[in-house]
Swiss-Prot record:
Structural rigidity of the outer membrane of elementary bodies and porin forming, permitting diffusion of solutes through the intracellular reticulate body membrane. It comes from the Bacteria. The keyword Signal does not apply. Disulfide bond interactions within and between MOMP molecules and other components form high molecular-weight oligomers. This is Major outer membrane protein. Disulfide bonds: none annotated. It is found in: Cell outer membrane.
């Protein structure tokens, strides 16, 4: 699952939040 945080940063959701560059 891929979502975006409030700043539009791509965040990978896989048990924990990780920033995806």
């Amino acid at each position: 699952v891929t979502v975006y945080d409030a700043e539009g940063t791509k965040v990978q959701v896989d048990g924990s939040l990780r920033l995806v560059e």
